Amino acid sequence: MSLKIVVLAKQVPDTRNVGKDAMTAEGTVNRAALPAIFNPEDLNALEQALRLKEQYPGSTVGILTMGPPRAGEIIRQGLYRGADTGWLLTDRKFAGADTLATSYALATAIQKIGDVDLVIGGRQAIDGDTAQVGPQVAQKLGLNQVTYAEEIQKIEDGKATIRRMIDGGVETVEAPLPVVITVNGTAAPARPCNAKLVMKYKYATCPMERTGKEPWAELLEQRPYLTLNQWSVADVDGDEEQCGLSGSPTKVKTVQNIVFQAKESKTISGSDEDIDSLIKELLDEKIIG
């Protein structure tokens, strides 16, 4: 038995380095002003997919992501770890999407890919923390869904057996294929990049990532696998009104950058006088009563 697996992955801003230019005037994320990383829980999802690929010979794993051309790096990171292919949804008409528009775009792409057995993604992205996209994709495709997965244990008789977190413990469930699964950050961590695969795919790019002046450009004709799939709204037969800002009823009004400042401290000795003074100060400021 072989499986066709699609991993939903996202290039996200590194939220440890959010500055004053993080948002645009329209209330969308200014991704060009922020360092970008592979969404952590999507790496957990990728690991589950790669384990299934090893468990069921002949299976394939593809990375599906949406973003600007530089998001092609997410596909490369997947290829370096053992994925077989990838698709980048990139089009100005996809820009500014909330979870509803994002899930619509991903669902139309999955329909174009066709005959998918499992769609696996991280529980949520660190830039939005909504945990909505996976379930929304399942709803739009009319597929079964399992959330908060810790491990995809086996595929047997057309069903996936999944161990998932619940309040106060874990449960094991079965879900008929095809199924959408979202994976927790506490699941098995992603394997490191494979050196041989890095050498094989380091020049793998989408057409919009290239300038045409790369010294390795002649390799593209010799090695077709170095050209990654790049799809626009038209390529996936999408409705422009349901994509990007046009299809996004959610709008971010403001984002505030909170700066924590240390207050002045003082050292209190253990003398009776200092202790009495401290208690009086706390009472006066109504910190204790």
Regions from the language model: what does each represent?
Residues M1-G289:
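N-terminal glycine-rich FAD/FM-binding segment characteristic of electron-transfer flavoproteins
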